[in-house]
Amino acid sequence: MSKYNFFKKILRDNYKGEIIEGDKKYKIFNEVKKLNFLCTKKRNLVLIFCHNEMQSIISYLWALANNNIAILVNSNLDYNLAENLIKKYSPDIIITKYSNKFKNYNVEVEINKFFYLKKISSGKNKFFKDLALLLPTSGSTGSPKFVRISYKNLYYNTKDIVNYLHIKPFDITITTLPFSYTYGMSIINSHIFVPSKIIAYNGTVIERRFFELIKKWKVNSFGGVPLIFEMLKRLKLENFDLSSLKYITQAGGPLSKQLIKFFHNSFKKKKIKFITMYGSTEATSRMSYLPEKFNQTKTTSIGKGLQKSFKINDLNTGKEINENNKLGELVYFGKNVCLGYSLNSKDLSLKDQNKGILKTGDIGYKDEDGFFYVTGRLDRYVKIYDQRMNMDDIEKILLLKFSNICVKYKNKK
């Protein structure tokens, strides 16, 4: 078993972590133990259709605690796309809420409306010794391209997040994002690491039930992507009891300057920290944070690296730029940088191809105080009359004048 596998402590009977669903608390140790009948002498490849429900999260924790490799996919993945993934990766175990009859798999058992399927004929797999997870690169499109994450990646990224956010054993979080999505997964992992408590909530943030659970269980934190905060802005937050919340994190894409300031001011009145973060699946989730005290003065900054490991490379030469405020590609260094990608089961034996270096594909710069900014994407550049122009910049300029933008093109010109 990997020395970096912090999930294995779940198997100890003194593990204190809990999952809350509805009005009940469940000890994670007890629930994971119920799945030990799935254990074999070899490491298994486990495909999990992820739901923000207790049994689904427990299945994920069981897989990693027992040194298996988990493939996490969205629960709403189309059946035909799922069949294609199964052909490409040939998992030993499938965990799904839907008893679809996948070829060459038998239903072993049903627990809490989740079906555990085992492959009829399972051969010997070759896995890289520290491989832990396969995370999708494209949401629910069913692409066979996955990011290969190691137990070492998970350990260092989770430890950094726990240390920065000061997560304690008495803290309680609530799920707001699919855990097949790296940001949602990292919130679960950080509270398993401590360990503390997780509320398995499968609804949206605009439902009354969400706020009832926050009040009932005295939730301390939750995370959101831009869409979640756009929805929250429509609500009158002053009408809800959020007194137990200590902080709220935002990642998964840039939030507008106006929204950052709006939520910073709204939450500040309630003594809640609003922390913006930057990350990617290839970095096992989060790479940087903006300290809350800079929300007003460096609003659009992604902040500083969790491991202080960013640099800016020249777009033409690839060499490091030491000047401030000069655009280049943002490059990240860290022990949380993924192993590489996979397209099929053969790739699961590959070793670390990235060696701790991630070229993000983001265009940005560093200011005189060492804070980093992202202005666009490398693949969002076009050349017009030999001039490189960033479509993100063009879009921002147009949005200053127009509320909506439509582009009409003919013959792909």
Model regions: which residues?
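Conserved AMP-binding/adenylate-forming
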Residues: 34-77, 176-178, 388
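Conserved pre-ATP/AMP-binding loop-to-beta segment of ANL
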Residues: 11-12, 115-136, 143, 166-172
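Conserved AMP-binding/adenylate-forming core of the ANL superfamily
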Residues: 4-8, 12-41, 83, 149-152
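Gly/Ser/Thr-rich phosphate-binding loop
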Residues: 219-224, 233-297
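Conserved AMP-binding A3 loop
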Residues: 24-25, 132-159
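Conserved AMP-binding/adenylation subdomain of ANL enzymes
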Residues: 155-172, 180-221, 306
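AMP-binding/adenylate-forming catalytic core of the ANL superfamily
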Residues: 48, 334, 339-340, 361-413
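Conserved ATP/PPi-binding loop(s) of AMP-dependent carboxylate-activating enzymes
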Residues: 304-307, 319-351, 389
